[in-house]
Amino acid sequence: MWIANLGNRHIAFKEKLWYKTVASEIAKDIIAESTGLRVGMTYCDPAMAVHTGADIKTIKDTFEDNGVPMDCSVNNRIYYAQAIHAALAEEVSPGVPRLQILSSGCPYLIRTLPLMKFDLRPGRELAMADHKHDHACVTLSYYLISHASDERKSFTQHHLPRWMRPNFKKRY
């Protein structure tokens, strides 16, 4: 999934799904699909960086060897649900949502996002339940979690009291 970061706005504009494809081929496809775009970061599941069995290289290493540097995100379903809900609920200005999803570029995400439900097990009420079509939503949440600390500019004006202004001089 490709998401444009416009300061405090995020626009999901492109997605691609791969089935039964090796990591090196996916990396080549990502590079081809990203031609002409200024890709700043690629986020992945932390499980991609785990050595399993006798593997010398991890899946993340394979991507990086093929030209796609990756940064591991957080793997926590409670954070997934909170990140997506917060991004959909916030506005950067009146009528302009913080997160926009282009229907022409992300039809799978638009189709599967409403299918996501909360996990009803005790202690996980705020977590996103596991679902066979959760891949696009998890990808979106990896991005949102990694950008959770981005500056959020409110569209409401806050009046700064005179005594808090930098040029204010106290008189005694």
Predicted regions and their residues:
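Acidic, Mg2+-coordinating catalytic module of metal-dependent nucleases/exonucleases
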Residues: M128-T156
